[in-house]
Amino acid sequence: MIRDEISVSIQTLRWKCIESRAYSKRLHYGRFALSPLHKGRADTIGIAMRRALLGEVEGTCITRVKLENIKHEYSAIIGIEESVHDILMNLKEIVFRSDSYGIREASIYIVGPRNVTAQDIILPPSVKIIDTTQHIARLTKSITSDIRLQIEKNRGYIIHSPNNYQDGIFPIDAVFMPVRDANYSIHSYGSGNEIREVLFLEIWTNGGLTPREALYEASRNLIDLFIPFLHGEEQNIDGMNNKKGSNMLPFPLSHVLTDTGETKEKIAFQLIFIDQLELPPKTYNSLRRANIHTLLDLLNYSREDLMRIEHFGKESVEQVLEVLQKLFAIDPPRN
C-alpha cells in the first residue's frame, strides 16, 4: 500500500505516520515513513534521527527529594512500609509532561494510613503527571508525610555521586529521555538510475511525549545544528573560509596533537572530515567510495590497506601520507 502511494508522487518528499498505538499511559508506539529518497540517503537520515531521538529530545522528571529528619537513603521510616531508597526509586519512575523550562517545585502532604500515589503530588500549573496511579509509598499508621520535590526539564541524564546527601535532601539520578527506543529500516524499489528508498522509523516513548511529538522535536534539533553553517560566511567565522593556505578546521590542530587521552583523540579525529584535507579529487573520491569519511576512518588503514582500495595507486597513497605528516605529524603503519 505504501509503495502504491509513493509511486503516485515520486517528487514529493514527506513524512507519513503509518501506525500509532498507546499500549499504556507510559508506553506509546509510532511508525513513520519518509519517502521518496535517493539511494543512500535513507541510511544517513535514519542514523541521525535515531541519535537525535535517543539523546536530544527533552523530558521532565524529579531531580531532588527532601525528607524531613531523614539522614540516610536506607533509613526506615516508622509508619511507612517502604524504605527511603524504595520511595526515591518510585519517585524516579514517575513520568511528567511540562510546557516550561527550568526547575519547578512540587510537594506531597498526606496523613495516613493510606496509599500514596502520583495523584497526591501537588504540582505547579505547567507540569502534568502522565500516570497518576503510579505507587509512591504506603502509610501504615496515622502519621503525616511531608515530601518536597524538585522537578526539572532537560535532556540526556544526570548521575549524582553516591552518598551526596545532606539535611534530608536526596539528589536523584535523572533520566530525561522520553524516547525509550528508536529503530529504523529501509525499503528500496525501482531499478537502474531510478532506485528510490523508503525510510521506516519506529519510536517508543514513555508517554511524556507522543512519538509524533518526539519526531518533530528531534527533527527541529537536527535543523538547528546546521543553521550556523548557513550563516557562517556572513558571520566571518575564523577558519571556515576556503582560501588556499587557510586553516579549515574549526579548532587548532594543536588541540588534537597535544591530547594524550586515547578516547578524546578519537573524538577529535571523528570531527575532521577528509574533505578538509584538500586532497586531489581523484584521491578524495576513491576514499569516499571506500566509506572513508573522517580522519579516524583514514587512520584505521595501513599503507598496504590503502593500496588495496580500488583506483587507489601508489601516487594517491603518497598524497595521503604527505597530508597526514604535514598537518598532523602522523605516519600510518606499513601493514
From Swiss-Prot:
InterPro entries hit by this protein: DNA-dir_RNA_pol_insert, DNA-dir_RNA_pol_RpoA/D/Rpb3, DNA-dir_RpoA, RBP11-like, RNAP_asu_C, RNApol_insert_sf
Region of interest (Alpha N-terminal domain (alpha-NTD)), residue spans: 1-233
Its localization reads: Plastid, Chloroplast
Q: Which UniProt keywords apply?
A: Chloroplast, DNA-directed RNA polymerase, Nucleotidyltransferase, Plastid, Transcription, Transferase
Q: Which parts of this chain are annotated as the region Alpha C-terminal domain (alpha-CTD)?
A: 264-335
Q: Which SUPFAM superfamilies match?
A: C-terminal domain of RNA polymerase alpha subunit (SSF47789), Insert subdomain of RNA polymerase alpha subunit (SSF56553), RBP11-like subunits of RNA polymerase (SSF55257)
Q: What's an example GO BP annotation here?
A: DNA-templated transcription
Task: Give the record's family classification.
Answer: Belongs to the RNA polymerase alpha chain family.
Q: Which NCBIfam families match?
A: rpoA
Instruction: Please provide the record's free-text comment about the domains of this protein.
Output: The N-terminal domain is essential for RNAP assembly and basal transcription, whereas the C-terminal domain is involved in interaction with transcriptional regulators and with upstream promoter elements.
- Put simply, this protein is called DNA-directed RNA polymerase subunit alpha
Q: What is the lineage of its organism?
A: Eukaryota, Viridiplantae, Streptophyta, Embryophyta, Tracheophyta
